[in-house]
A protein has these predicted regions:
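C-terminal motif of bacterial Sec signal peptides marking the signal peptidase cleavage site
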Residues: 19-23
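A well-ordered secondary-structure block
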Residues: 82-178
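N-terminal low-complexity, intrinsically disordered segments
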Residues: 2, 24-26
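Bacterial N-terminal signal peptides that target proteins for export
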Residues: 1-11
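Aromatic-enriched hydrophobic runs in primary sequence
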Residues: 7, 25, 70-74, 96, ...
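Short, well-ordered surface patches within globular domains
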Residues: 26-92
Length: 178
């Protein structure tokens, strides 16, 4: 009986892993899958900080996103552009920042972006965004050290511009009330 339970548990774990790796998860949208993968990553790295997905401003971010801000490989923001913006790049970054102004008093407000080739799984997108891309810091308030976090807000969307797809992720670290 114990052997049967172990075999069934292993089979279930295998099916769940296959579901995650292939991106087939009971009809969940790609946006929600990306958010869940990020939530898993941040919950493992941030302790018991609750993670929510309520960032309605992601729509305004998507409307104001300009692909010219991306690095030449399409993964993450161009570090030269975000650290020394001029001309239209400066205007485009200001539009993104303005879309997230409701969170200006949060600990950190990050924006991740990348071009998404057809067929790239959500898990691969998250891996590339977290480990191989430069993010844009719209706001940061960490003077005096990193405060205790009340929650982390995370939202994702896939936007089409100029015939290409782009994954946008907003990550907001909300400080605990003092």
């Amino acid at each position: 009986m114990k052997l049967t339970k172990k075999l069934l548990a292993m089979a279930l774990a295998g099916v769940m892993l296959l579901t995650i790796l292939t991106g087939c998860s009971s009809g969940k949208s790609g946006d929600r899958l990306v958010e869940e993968y990020l939530a898993t990553f941040f919950s493992e790295n941030s302790g018991d900080v609750p993670i929510t997905h309520d960032v309605p401003e992601i729509k305004a971010v998507a409307e104001n996103f300009d692909p010219s801000l991306l690095a030449s490989n399409g993964i993450g923001f161009d570090a030269k552009v975000i650290h020394n913006p001029t001309g239209s790049a400066s205007d485009n970054l200001q539009k993104l920042k303005s879309a997230l102004v409701n969170y200006k008093n949060c600990t950190n407000v990050y924006l991740y972006a990348m071009a998404v080739p057809e067929g790239l799984s959500e898990l691969t997108q998250v891996t590339l965004l977290l480990y191989y891309s430069s993010y844009y810091t719209a706001y940061t308030n960490t003077t005096g050290g990193l405060p205790t976090l009340d929650s982390i807000k995370c939202a994702s969307t896939l936007v089409k511009k100029g015939g290409k797809q782009y994954r946008l992720v907003v990550l907001i670290q909300v400080p605990a009330a003092s």
